[in-house]
C-alpha cells in the first residue's frame, strides 16, 4: 500500500466512511474520486488497513478492565475524583464556561464500588439459594360416614 492509499484510508475513517470525500481529501481528482474510492475500498490492503485502524480506534476509546477496576478501587478508597464541565453556546458556536472540580465519593458510592469489585473477583455471591423441603402432615383417621 502506498502513501496516497494510506492517506485515503485515514481520510475515509475521519470523514465518517465517505469514500468520495476521502479520495478528494487524499489528493485524488474530483472527477474520478467516486469510482476511485470504490476501487480502493475493494483493494485488500486498503480494506485490511481500514479494518485494523477501526479496531485500534475502538480499543483506544473503550475503557479497559484494568482501568475500570482501578477507578472502582479509587472510588472505594474514597479518593477525590476530578470532574470537568463545559457549557457550550451552540448558537454563537463558543464555550461559555469551563469548570474543573473535585468530587469526594459518598459512602453509598464507595460501598457500590466495593460490591462491584467483589462481584468481579467472585468473592461476592449475589444469588440467593432456595431449597425445597417436603413437609408430611398426618391428620389422623378419616371416616366417610361422619
Swiss-Prot record:
Keywords: DNA-binding, Host-virus interaction, Inhibition of host innate immune response by virus, Viral genome packaging, Viral immunoevasion, Viral release from host cell. Coiled coil: none annotated. The keyword DNA-binding applies. It comes from the Viruses. It holds the Pfam family Terminase_2. GO terms for biological process: chromosome organization; symbiont-mediated suppression of host innate immune response. Disruption phenotype: Virus assembly is blocked at the procapsid stage; DNA is not packaged and tails are only rarely assembled on the propcapsid. One of its GO terms (molecular function) is DNA binding. Belongs to the SPP1-like small terminase family. Homodecamer. Interacts with the terminase large subunit; the active complex is probably composed of a one monomer of the large subunit and two or more decamers of the small subunit. Implicated in the production of cabRNA, an RNA that activates the host CBASS antivirus system. When the gene is mutated the virus becomes resistant to the host CBASS CdnE-Cap15 system. The terminase small subunit specifically recognizes the non-adjacent pacL and pacR packaging subsites and regulates the ATPase activity of the terminase large subunit. The terminase lies at a unique vertex of the procapsid and is composed of two subunits, a small terminase subunit involved in viral DNA recognition (packaging sequence), and a large terminase subunit possessing endonucleolytic and ATPase activities. Both terminase subunits heterooligomerize and are docked on the portal protein to form the packaging machine. This is Terminase small subunit.
